[in-house]
Amino acid sequence: MATPIYPPAGPYETGFLDTGDGNRVYYEQIGSPAGKPVVSVHGGPGAGSPRRPLRAWDPTRYRVIRFDQRNCGRSTPHGSDPAADMRLNTTWHLVDDMERLREHLGVERWLVSGASWGVTLALAYAQRHPDRVSELLLQAVMTSSRSEIDWLYRGAGRFHPEAWERFRAGVPEDERDGDLLAAYVRLMESPDRAVRARAAADWLGWEDAVITGEPNGVPGMYSDRDVDEQIAFVRICAHFFSHGAWLEEDQLVRDAGKLAGIPGLVATGRHDMGCPPHTAWELAKAWPDARLHISDDSGHVGSESMMRVVRDAIEEFKDR
């Protein structure tokens, strides 16, 4: 079936959600106010929602809600500000923000869509609030287990040894054989902006290297942002992953049975170097209503064939 790509749609409403602890979460609504509600969960953590208009969602049938997770994008305080308190930014703070946003916008149930880190947050939310989720649409699957995090920031270095050596060299010499993520956290909490900026550039150089070597990899995908955005992204990312995203090991796969009755698509790339397809496979086995698609011509970014599968699911879900 030929899946449509719709005319660009921008927001019809923007606003800020006051979380009650000094944070303000930016959100926007796109499409039809009377449409089927969707919440789009961005990656990173710390990347912020994309600024580009939506094309895959029918703006006459869907009400798409995008938001910037704490301390990134247009949410305040921004993570580039050393005064932003990272102790108030955890997976479970973000889950609570999503539920608070749903209530604020008067949504009964919504389709939850996420990619990469957004899959982790989408699953954490859906497993805590399954009665509020109509469907799940998950791409480039990552559940932020310790083993996945260790693969991304250590194991993948077997394929990119020169880039990983540069990443490792970004921390003080006496910390290079220890916990690299904790070392980067310390650098990102430095009062010296130059130290934070250098560490952010080193971290994002590694992320770029991993994705550039994949099919359809985009050079500069992570580093192509201004310095404040780089600092916020890496500060948040290092903070989350050094804490194992405040999840028990394999928690989101282990508890996937809580999603029974929620239909969903699990779409991932066969050649995803950062988030290998094993996790998507295990998740789909544990989730009774999941449909798994592994795209043979995709990495983390995806491909046109994978996007067709995703758009088919979007078209299917709008009629449920």
Task: Identify the residue ranges that each predicted region occupies.
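Catalytic active-site module of serine/aspartate enzymes centered on a nucleophile-bearing elbow/loop
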Residues: 290-320
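Conserved acidic catalytic loop of the alpha/beta-hydrolase fold
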Residues: 92-110
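Conserved HGGG/HGGXW glycine-rich cap/lid loop of the alpha/beta-hydrolase fold
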Residues: 18-78
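Short beta-strand/loop motif that positions the catalytic acidic residue
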Residues: 259-260, 266-268
